[in-house]
Amino acid sequence: MAENADDRVAVIATDGFEEAELTEPVKALRDAGLKVDIIAPHSGSIQGFKHHDKSKTIPVDRTLDQADPEDYIALVLPGGALNADAMRMNDQAQDFIRAMDGAHKPLAIICHAPWELVSAGLARGRTMTSWPTLQDDIRNAGGQWVDREVVVDGNLITSRKPDDLPAFNRELLARVTHQHASAAAGDWPAGDAAGGRAAASDRPQNRRREGAGKQKAPTA
């Protein structure tokens, strides 16, 4: 387990992430005194986008091979269609998401990233929002889709798009600071930040086989 794991947040992404949906939550978390690791399938850096145009690259702190869910108190999944489409097919990313959810840790997921929740088998019975074109996928996976700037269902926080980031970051910080305080007090794992949610391990899931399956994001 990593040193000072009680104040460390994971962000999983790859090439094609929507820039603001990664950089703004990371800034909000770091400004609150939390440590953030950018985790990707490969080392080096990942390419961001502003809508359809390439923007900045972000250095990778750890690869999925190196990252352990036990080292983190929360998980952020930024959007970007290319990013989310690649990560939903990555077995290591899916296992990481399931482990975080099974430990009742906050999952903050925005825009196209709920695809990753669907592919992890974690949408059934949950209420969430997303980029509007994902609503049929969420409903077909057994989830309830609503059109709101931010939706909180137990440990799950979801938003639709970059315009929703102020509300998304507000709810993320509220739940991560709760998790941080609980972990620092020795109540580890801290449990469901919002209460009342069954553990992912208590719900039927279609788990992918363990492994390191990777798929590159398609070119635009």
Tell where the protein language model's regions lie, with residue ranges.
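Extended, subdomain-level signal for the structured scaffold at the beginning of enzyme domains
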Residues: M1-A103, L107, W115-T127, Q135-A220
